[in-house]
Amino acid sequence: MGRAREMGWMAAGLMIGAGACYCMYKLTMGRDEGNELENEEEDEWDDEQDLDEEEADIWFDFTAMARPWSEDGEWDEPGAPGGTEDRRSGGGKANRAHPTKQRPFPYEHKNIWGVQSFQTFPCALNLTKCAFSQGKKMFTESTIAGFSLTHNVSRHLSSLSVVGSRSPTPQPTVREKALDVPEHPNSSIENQDQIKMYIDEVCRDAVFCCCKSFLQQAGLGLLISMTVINNMLAKSLSDPKFPLLSEGSGCAKVQGLEAQMSLPEKPVLAEEVLAAQMLFSFMCLFTRSGSREMLVEAISP
C-alpha cells in the first residue's frame, strides 16, 4: 500500500516536471519565432520603402493632370509639381506623402503662343520680299495667335507691328494690307500711341496714292477708327499735311468728305472740324468743275 502511494506521487511529479519543461520550451521557441517574424516584417517594410522611393521618381497623378490650371498659372491642388499628395500605400500601412516631379511638356506650358513669341512674327515678313506673300501673311497673321490669345488682342499685336514695319514699303498692296488689318485699335491708349508713331505714313498713303483707291480707303478706315475715343482724325484733317479734299483722287475726296460729315455726331470733334476745314472742303467742291457730283454722292443717304 505504501509502495503504491509512492509510485503515484512519483508519476505526478514527473508529469508536472514534464509539463513545466514543455512550457519553458514553448516560451523559448515562441520568442525566437516572434523575433524572426518581426525581422521579416522589418525587412518587408524596408523593401516597401525602397520601392516607394523608386516609384516616386516615375509616379504621376493622372487625375490631377486633368485638373485645370488656376488663373495665375499655378497648380494649387493635390498632385501639383513639387508638391505632395497623400495616397494609400500597399499592405494597409499608414498614409505617407509621395513627392511628384515637374510634369513634362506640354503640361508645363499653359499657352503655346504668348505675347513674346508672337512679336517675332514680323521678322518673317521682313525676310519675305514678295509683295503677294507679305500681303497674304498680314491677312492671316491675326488669326494664328488666336490659338492662345483672344481674337481682338491678337489682332492688335499683329496690326500695330505691321502698320509700323510695312507702311514705308514701296508696294501699295502690302501697305493696303497693313492698314486694313486693325479692326478695333482703340482698345487702349498704348495701342493708339503706337499707331500715332506712324500716322504720317498713313496720311501720306491716303493722300498721295491717288490711283490706289483701296489703299486710300484702308488709310481712311484706320484714321476714322481712331476717332472713337479721341480727336486724332479731326487734327489730321485740319493739318496742312493732310490736304485730302484738295489733292486726293475723286474717290478719296468723297470718302474724306463722308468722314468729315460723320464727325459732327461726336460733339467733342464737331467744333474743331466744322470751324474751318469743313467749310473749306465744301468751297473746294463747289468751285471746281466736276466736283458737285462728288458732293451729291457724299451727302446723299
From Swiss-Prot:
Translocase is among the record's keywords: no
Stretches assigned to the Cytoplasmic side: 26-301
Region of interest (Mitochondrion outer membrane (MOM)-targeting sequence), residue spans: 1-6, 26-36
Mitochondrial intermembrane topological domain residue ranges: 1-7
Transmembrane segments: 8-25
Keywords: Membrane, Mitochondrion, Mitochondrion outer membrane, Signal-anchor, Transmembrane, Transmembrane helix
GO cellular component, one term: mitochondrion
Domain of life: Eukaryota
Pfam families recorded: Arm_2
UniProt key word Membrane: yes
Family according to the record: Belongs to the eutherian X-chromosome-specific Armcx family.
Name under which the protein is recorded: Protein ARMCX6
Species for this entry: Rattus norvegicus
Gene that specifies this protein: Armcx6
